[in-house]
C-alpha cells in the first residue's frame, strides 16, 4: 500500500509542475485534463502526507522512550503520545485503504433523476411528488442546482412521472444509491376508515452522459413533433413545440413538452435519452459484477424494494443496510445525508472486504 501511495504522491508533484507550464496552459483541453487528474489525487496525497507526519511523530516519541537519560515525566508524556499516535495511524490506514479503492468513473457527474408512480393510484402519485420535493430540498441544502426536465402530473398535486436534473460536483456519488423501489405506508386523507394504504414508486438515478461517454448517432434517432397539452387535453400552446425522440435500435422513447421552444424540448429529450442509453451499459456491467458480489448496496437493481416510509410510525427503513430512522418529517424535507453516509460506508466496507479476501 505504501509503495502505491508514494507513487501517487510523486505523480501528484509531477502534475503540480506540469499544470504551471506555459505550453500546457496554452493547450486548454490538455491543461483541463491534467488539472482534473491533479484534483482527483489531492485528497489521497494530503491524507498520505498526514500519515507520514504522524508516523514521524510516533518514531520521535519512541526515540524519547528509548532514551534512558530522559526525564521520567518526559518519558510518561512520550508513552501517552505513542498510544494516541498509534490509534491515529490505524484510523489513517483505514481511510487510505478506502481512498485507494477503484473509483466509479461516473461519481463526479451531474445526474438525471426519474421518479415514476407505481402501485397505489393517486397515493403513489402524491408520494412521487413528496420524493421530488425531498431530493430538491436536499440538493438546495448542499448547494446543487435543480432543473426540471419533464413532468406528467396527476392534476391533484402528484406526478405520474417526473424527470429532473441535479447539477453539482459528486451528485452521482451521493445519489446513485437512491435507485430502486420506494414504498410508502400511510392513511390517505380521503380514507374515512383510517386504513393504511401501501403504495410504491420507482426512482432511477442516471449519470449525465456526454459525447465522450456515449456517442449518439443521429441516424439512429427519429424525431417527432406534436402539440403539447395540459390536463384534460387542453391546449397549452398553438405550436408544435412538444418533441418525441425515438432511439430506433433499442426502441427507447423520450418525450418532452415542458418548454415553449421546440429546440429546448429536443435538447432535453436527447439529454435524457443519452443518459438512459448509458445507464443500460452501466446496468449490464453491474449485473456482471453482482454475480461475483454479495453486495446489497451497490447493485442498483431497479426492481429491488430498497426503502419503506411508514407515516403512522414516523420511520424510514432502508432494507439493504437494515437502518431505521425515526424522523420521517425532516427526512422528507431533505435531511437525508445520514442515510446516504450509511449507504456509502456500507458499500465501501463491502468493497474493502472483497479486496482483502
UniProtKB/Swiss-Prot annotation:
Where in this protein does the record say N5-methylglutamine is found?
234
- Among the Pfam families in the record, one is PCRF
- What does the entry report about post-translational modification of this chain? Methylated by PrmC. Methylation increases the termination efficiency of RF1.
Gene Ontology terms, MF aspect: translation release factor activity, codon specific
The GO cellular component terms are: cytoplasm
Give all cystine bridges in this chain. none
- The yes or no answer to whether the keyword tRNA processing is present is no
Gene3D superfamilies found in the cross-reference section: 3.30.160.20, 3.30.70.1660, 6.10.140.1950
Compartments (UniProt record): Cytoplasm
The record's family statement is:
Belongs to the prokaryotic/mitochondrial release factor family.
Function, in words: Peptide chain release factor 1 directs the termination of translation in response to the peptide chain termination codons UAG and UAA.
NCBIfam families linked to this entry:
prfA, PRK00591.1
The protein here is known as Peptide chain release factor 1
**Which species does the entry assign this protein to?**
Alkaliphilus oremlandii (strain OhILAs)
